[in-house]
Curated annotation (Swiss-Prot):
It is a peripheral membrane protein. Two distinct, membrane-bound, FAD-containing enzymes are responsible for the catalysis of fumarate and succinate interconversion; the fumarate reductase is used in anaerobic growth, and the succinate dehydrogenase is used in aerobic growth. It comes from Proteus vulgaris. This is Fumarate reductase flavoprotein subunit. Its main location: membrane.
Length: 598
């Protein structure tokens, strides 16, 4: 067992983790920062984000507009003080990224270009062609290399955190390259481990997005908040989970059913907009939850297109022309050709909704700290209260840098004021973690982790998908209970120590099962329809602000189902109202202007 001493340990080296590391290094250059990642940083899932990052930049836009779009898009389950902080700090972070070298796309006059994104009243999504996540991550990674106090632990798998008298004090990890164990002591720990999309069978997430950080925090008594809200992205490639960015629709792409009809006009997002002239909050630029739900209704009505990869609709970009597609969406053209054999210049792309984003996560306060002193969470693994019941596209990349910076600065404050830890207590915890690992390694049985993982994914798709019924949710809950019992009998066939993926996948599955249970139980007990959580049973098809304008808190229960509690939503200036888009939104805006003008 190797021991390293640091001041701050950051788990995850994607956009949020790197931004936190840079912020901490700048806030106090004397502190040592351990940056721990399962993969080389440029392989983090942030790299897969294509569309863009939101920030007010145009004269006719405002923080209030961005606030209102976010709160309405989240179906009023957002913490409104958090949203205020977020929208006010987005422009600063986008500008900072540019100063560090992020190549934002430009207009002809040299100003930053912005594109339309779903649910946004005004175009405010900064982008770097259709590889925004890649360029942001590359910029952050390059910048982090300037700080010698940031020590990277690439290809290290975190098993658990160390907690002494209610204060986070470090982590224990496996060095995958050598097969050795590592204890990293610190006075503050930041979780930046990404979401949990891999608990679903079909998803847009990278293989490392398995809910590890959520599972670790959960087992230490930190609740997972609002886990029932899982976003389906409307335009994933069938079978692969590869995403066709929302930027396709922001540039003017359209969705049509088997009859070539732009069906979104029938679901509160119309009237139909002119071809190639997208309008904010209309049609294809509605919020993701509503666009995905429209697909489900078209499928039920028999108006989707049958393919060997399942039912799809068509994303048609042909009217945009080859020049625009190759300038603005070059990567999309490559992906469509590679994965479905379609050239978007000449043919429509088959797409269907795919599990994409976890709105819920590790509960934090507005400063990103959890209930454990010195333990912070940021990015998709966290629930700071920004996204509510449905995230707006391009708010997540901005969240990484806005709250990544905040988490880094707050961790510095905690690390500086910390008193010395009890070293013997940390060593005792480390031995317990090693003992638990040996038990996992030596477990005997006939079960296979891959089979259990596949069954978990299928169960989550069936019971916790776009639309939900109590019968199917209960079926999923029962299945997860069965799978957790079978998990106790998973035998590891690989006894080697170096890159033992058999062992690591088993550990990931254990975290995933815990997280999936929180999702399923939270969904079953939210007896209303809000945002990405939509129920079909009588009495639960509408939003219920009287009983469920509340956050769900799921607590770990080692003996069985998670224990659920509820907490109030912080509302500062936007009272819950009907979500409106398309022509109804335009009419509402007109009414509001008339009232304001007397």
């Amino acid at each position: 067992m190797q021991t390293f001493n640091a001041d701050i340990a950051i788990i995850g080296a994607g956009g949020a983790g790197l931004r936190a590391a840079i912020a901490a290094a700048e806030a106090n250059p004397q502190l040592k920062i351990a940056l721990i990642s399962k993969v080389y940083p440029m392989r983090s899932h942030t790299v897969a984000a294509e569309g863009g990052s939101a920030a007010v930049t145009q004269a006719h836009d405002s923080y209030d507009f961005h606030f209102n779009d976010t709160v309405s898009g989240g179906d009023w389950l957002c913490e409104q003080d958090v949203v205020d902080y977020f929208v006010e700090h987005c422009p600063t972070e986008m500008t900072q990224l540019e100063l560090w070298g992020c190549p934002w796309s430009r207009k002809e006059d040299g100003s930053v270009n912005v594109r339309r994104f779903g649910g946004m009243k005004i175009e405010r999504t900064w982008f770097a062609a259709d590889k925004t996540g890649f360029h942001m991550l590359h910029t952050l990674f390059q910048t982090s290399l300037k700080y010698p106090q940031i020590q990277r632990f690439d290809e290290h798998f975190v098993l658990d955190i160390l907690v002494d008298e209610g204060h986070a004090r470090g982590v224990v990890a496996i060095n995958m390259m050598e097969g050795t164990k590592v204890q990293i002591r610190a006075n503050a720990v930041i979780m930046a481990t990404g979401g949990a999309g891999r608990v679903y069978r079909f998803n847009t997430n990278g293989g490392i997005v398995t809910g590890d950080g959520m599972g670790i925090a959960l087992r230490h008594g930190v609740p997972l908040r609002d886990m029932e809200f899982v976003q389906y992205h409307p335009t994933g490639l069938p079978g692969s989970g590869i995403l066709m960015t929302e930027g396709c629709r922001g540039e003017g792409g359209i969705l049509v059913n088997k009859d070539g009809y732009r069906y979104l006009q029938d679901y509160g997002l119309g009237p139909e907009t002119p071809l190639g002239k997208p309008e904010n909050k209309y049609m294809e630029l509605g919020p993701r939850d509503k666009v995905s739900q429209a697909f489900w209704h078209e499928w039920r009505a028999g108006r989707t297109i049958k393919t060997h990869r399942g039912d799809v609709v068509h994303l048609d970009l042909r009217h945009l022309g080859a020049k625009k597609l190759h300038e603005r969406l070059p990567f999309i053209c490559e992906l469509a050709k590679a994965y479905v054999g379609v050239d978007p210049v000449n043919e429509p792309i088959p797409v269907r909704p795919t599990a994409h984003y976890t709105m819920g996560g590790i509960e934090t306060n507005q400063r990103t700290e959890t209930r454990i002193k010195g333990l912070f969470a940021v990015g998709e693994c966290s629930s700071v209260g920004l996204h509510g019941a449905n995230r707006l596209g391009s708010n997540s990349l901005a969240e990484l840098v806005v709250f990544g910076r905040l988490a880094g600065e707050e961790a510095v404050r905690r690390a500086q004021e910390a008193t010395p830890a009890n070293a013997s207590a940390l060593d005792a915890q480390t031995r317990d973690i090693e003992d638990n690992l040996k038990k996992l390694m030596n477990q005997k049985g006939s079960e296979n982790w891959a089979q259990i993982r596949d069954e978990m994914g299928e169960a989550m798709e069936e019971g916790c998908g776009i639309y939900r019924t109590p019968e199917l949710m209960q079926k999923t809950i029962d299945k997860l209970t069965e799978l957790k019992e079978r998990f106790k009998h998973v035998e590891i066939k690989d006894t080697s120590s170096v890159f033992n993926t058999d062992l690591l996948y088993k550990i990931e599955l254990g975290f995933g099962l815990d997280v999936a249970e929180c999702m399923a139980h939270s969904a079953f007990n939210r007896k209303e329809s809000r945002g990405a959580h939509q129920r079909l049973d009588e009495g639960c098809t509408e939003r219920d602000d009287v009983n469920f304008l509340k956050h769900t808190l799921a607590f770990y229960n080692p003996e069985g189902a998670p224990r659920l509690e509820y907490s109030d939503v912080k509302i500062t200036k936007s009272a819950p109202a009907k979500r409106v888009y398309g022509g109804e939104a335009t009419a509402q805006d007109k009414q509001n202007k008339e009232k304001a003008n007397g």
